[in-house]
Amino acid sequence: MKLRLLATIMAVLASAHTARAQAMFPSETDNAALRYWFALGEVQEPSDDATRRLFEETTAGRVAWDESKLGPILDFNEDALRTMQQATKLPECNWGFEYRNGAAIPPWFALRARLLSRLNELQGIRDMAHGDSGTAVNTWLAGVHFGQDMSRSGPVIAALTAHAIILDNLQPLRDSAQQGKLNEEQKAELSVVVKTIPEDGFDWGVAWGVEFAIGDQFLQKSRTARKPESDDKIRAYEEYMLAAQAVLRETPAEAESRIADLEPNLRRLGKVEQNLIPSLRGTNEARIRLVTARDELMQALSTK
């Protein structure tokens, strides 16, 4: 009897220990943004002007890779880069900004995201200089995915940052293909991947939807101000923003004429409403730059 009781007590204690052990290891998140936040918090730019200039010249393709001068920068930022690159493999990305509750993107957000992208571009250049073209391609593709994730659930400033990040990483892919640094098998595999990327990078209408929500909230709150905006002005603003979203879901070439048609509507809006609206033409020009970069890459990949 005592032996059975002792065995029961030991089994209960063992199960409790197992439960505690399991509780210490919760499942990992599928939200890439949480890891991006860590990477953005860790990334550091070069501390001296000479190194920063060399960094810029190298990513621009004007000078060759210099391991002794630029390698330490990448080594210092290795954890941030690895965290970002691993995050691009996750299926979701929600940055968590609650714009309707007054949240705003921190001023440093876009600057650090772009720095992380440029370091990723530099890492690919380093990989290529060391003869590892396959790793270089994967590094730059991770940068493209990071740019696409940057665009998710953010306003137009996030979309413009995303567009710059994608360009940072499409251009070295194009240059490598044009300069014969990729073999035919690599070019064929990369071509398949690039075809899955939207021609303008991502859905720009989402960013304008966020801008619409932010601006509309501001205007609705203005109803309680001493000089509230009129219902007609608010309605005209809403109609313009909805039309702009629709335009941005057409191809950039098709959107150009539609944007011209909308400009009289923009000029008729009140000053307050106009100040809430980003440049629709500037947004479409950014889309055109992405289309051009993607087309140039596809052309380089198809050249024997």
Predicted regions and their residues:
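Bacterial N-terminal signal peptides
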Residues: 7-16
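Bacterial N-terminal signal peptides that target proteins for export
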Residues: 1-7
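Short acidic linear motifs
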Residues: 16-304
